[in-house]
Amino acid sequence: MIINPENVPNRTTTIYPQEFKSLVLGRVKKAVGNAAGLKNFGVNLVTLAPGSCSALRHWHTRQDEFIYVLEGEVTLVTNEGAQILQPGMMAGFPAGEDNGHHLVNRSQAAVVYLEIGDRTADDEAHYPDNDLMARASADGWILTHKDGTLYES
């Protein structure tokens, strides 16, 4: 199926609790994989405004992630530190590797990249820099503090 990204709705919402939502302001996702009817993995066309980030720094227990930079210069932050990615560069994040990652737009121009991830069940996302855990369920993500108490929605 051919997808014109201009026909895919913008998504600016986040599952994060209120105290973390401001960190992803300026992030716009288009679920182009869903628009194509994909079921086993997701593909998002993501735009980050200057100063925005892709997510809180995190890693997944069961789901692989991959990004491909299309436009702009973005900073990848991992356990190893910060690295600049430019158009054509890619990065992969294998499931189960305790190496939190996220992208930060520290430039003065928009960044556009593809974000690809599988949809393996029973995944957990760990956020090493924040008091947050996420566990996948049939109804979406369950967000808790690291001590297991639920965030109130």
Region locations from a protein language model:
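Conserved short histidine dyad/triad with adjacent acidic residue
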Residues: 26-31, 44-60, 98
